[in-house]
Amino acid sequence: VLENNADLGFAVDPDADRLAVVDEKGRPLGEEYTLVLSVDGYINTLGVESDIFVSNLSTSIALDKFALKNNCKVERSAVGEINVVNKMNKLDSNLGGEGNGGVILRECHLGRDSLVAVTMVLNRAAQSTSPLSEIYNSLPQFEIVKDKVNVDGIKIDDFFKSK
């Protein structure tokens, strides 16, 4: 991005279902914000006054706070693309995704797609004369730590009984 004096940059994973975005300063925005930027552009384009978006439980609350500010709501699903899609179908939601950079737009198809996400982020960027870093900074700022905890040897049923 910096070498080419680009306004923004994109990186996709090997099977192209997730997208990471880089601003004009060469700063990765974090894949959590791919979905937030997509929802921002979606709301602006369609003039949505209230809608339901779906994300999984492993997604930061930045999307929830942004949606609430725009009279919209976020419903959560279990982790996994199929769980997000099933919840979208149940709620008749048009847009969902995961905090891993995966965006799902019903209008295109019910699966994560980095090209859909690229289009939606470019749409959001085109709605403003501000650089992407300023658009990003205007969004609710939250971080999420994703880690695994080893529970070998712990009997989960017994653990919850004692609490």
Question: Where does each model-flagged region fall?
Answer:
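Short glycine/threonine-rich catalytic loop with a Thr-x-Gly-x-Asp
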Residues: V12-P14, P28-Y33, H109-R112
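N-terminal small/polar loop signature for handling phosphorylated ligands or for N-terminal nucleophile
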Residues: V1-V22
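Phosphate-binding and adjacent anionic-ligand microenvironments
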Residues: T45-K163
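Short, acidic/small-residue loops that bind anionic groups at enzyme active sites
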Residues: P28-E49, A78-G80
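Short Gly/Thr/Asp-enriched flexible loops that form oxyanion-binding sites at enzyme active sites
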Residues: D17-V36, L63-D64
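A generic local secondary-structure boundary/capping motif
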Residues: L8-G9, D40, V85
